[in-house]
Amino acid sequence: MHIDPYLVVRAGSLYVAALLTAAVWMWRRPAGRAFSGAVLAWFWNLPAVLALHLAAARLGWWSMNAEGGLLLGMPVDVYLSWAWLWGAVPALAFPSLPIVVVAAIALAFDLALMPAAAPVLRLGPDWLVGEGIGLALCLIPSQLLARWTVRDARLAGRAVLQVIAFSGLLLFVLPAVAIGVSDSAWLNPVDRPVWQLSLWVQLLLVPAIVGLSAVQEFVTRGGGTPVPFDPPQQLVVTGPYAYVRNPMQLSAVVLLALLGLFLRNPWVAAAGVMAHFYSTGIAGWDEDEDLRRRFGDNWLAYARDVRAWVPRLRPWRREGDRPARLFVASGCGMCSEVRGWFARHDARGLAIVPAETHESRALTRITFEPAGSGSEVTGVEAVARALEHLHLGWAFAGWALRLPGVRWFAQLLIDASGGEPRRIEISHVPHPSAIVSLDTAVSARIEDSRPVLRTRRDRQQGSGRL
C-alpha cells in the first residue's frame, strides 16, 4: 500500500500539533491568567508566522509546494500547527524555563522536522537565517507576552505586544481570510496614485489613534489591558472613554470598513459589519454585565450618559467630582499664552491653577493633575490631557499628541525652542480667586497680584517654559 508523503506531511502537521496542544492543555489545565497567556501567545503567532512565510518566500529561505487549503500561499494546516507549536505549547509546557532554553528546544525540533517536510516545504540554502529570525520575532515575543500576563508583570510591555498582535490579526490576517474565502485578490497599493495612498493612510490613522489612545488609557488609568482575562482594575472614564463607551471596538470596525474600501473588497468591509454586530450582541451584553458587577452604580451612571457607539461632542464628567487641575506658572510668558488660551475656551471639569501654589513641590513644567486616579503628567502631555476637557475635536488632537513617539518629538521641539524645564518655586497658598474653574467660565482670566518668588534665571530671562 502506497502512502503519499505529501498527505502525510499535511495531515500529520495538523493532527500531531493539535494532539500535542490538547495533551499539554490537559496536563496543565490552565485557568485565569495562565489560560489568557497561552491564548495570547497563539494570537501573537497568527500574524507573525504568516508574515514570516511571506518574507521567507520572497527572500528564498523556503517555499511551500502545496495546493488547496492555502492562505496567502501557505497551507492552513501547516500555518495553524506552526502557530500552536511556537505559541500555546511552549507557553504551557515550559512556563519556568529560561526563554533561551525554550528557543533552543524549538530550534532542535525544527532542525529535525523541517527537512523531513520536504514534500510540502522546500528549504533554501539560507533557511536557517529565516529560522533564527522566526524564533526572534515569533516565538520569543509570544513567550514574553505569555509570561508577563501570567505574572501580571510589565504592564506597558505586554500592552504593546497585545496591540501589535491584535493589529496584525485585524489588519492582516482577517482581511487575508476574507479575501481567501471570497476567492478575490489583493489590490496592489503600488497601483494607486501617491495622493490616494496618502489620503487613505490619513483616513486609517483617525480610528487607529482612537484605538491606541484607548489602550493607553487602560494602562495608565485602569492598570490593565484590553484582554478580558487581563482587564483594568479601575473603571476607565477618561480619554476616549469620556466620549464613547467602546472606543476600541469602534476603532476596529471603522478600520475594517475603511480597509475594505481601500482594497475595494466588500468582504473585508463585511468583516467590520460582522464585528459590529458581534460587539453589540453577545460580547457587548457579557461585557456590560461584568462591568456592572464589578463597578456597580459608578458604571450605571456612566453607561446612562455615554453611548456605546456614537461619541459625545463634550466629555462626560461624574457629578460631584472635583475638577482636574492644570498648573501653569503665573510669571511665565509662554505659559501665559497657554493659560490664556484655555481660559478663553469652555472646558469641562478643568481648573487652571498657578504653578507657584502647588501643595507639595516646586514644578518645572506645566503639570496636569487628574481628577480621579492616575499620576500627574507634565509638559506636552499635560497640555494634551487638558485638551480632552474641551470637545471631541480638541480631544482627538490631545490623543494624537499623547502617543509615545509623537509626545516625545513634540516635547523635543518645545525644549529646543526655549521651553526646557525651569524650576518654579512655591510661593504661597492660593486664594480661591486665583483658581479659575473652566466648568462655568467661558472667558475667565487668572489675576493674581500677590508677589511670587522667582528664580534668578526667571529674573534674568523673564521667559516661559512648557
Predicted segments with their positions:
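A short amphipathic helical element positioned immediately N-terminal to and/or at the very start
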Residues: 236-244
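Short pre-active-site segment immediately N-terminal to redox-active cysteine/selenocysteine motifs
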Residues: 330-331
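Short, cysteine/histidine-rich loop/knuckle motifs that typically chelate Zn2+
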Residues: 334
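Loop-to-transmembrane-helix entry motif
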Residues: 244-250
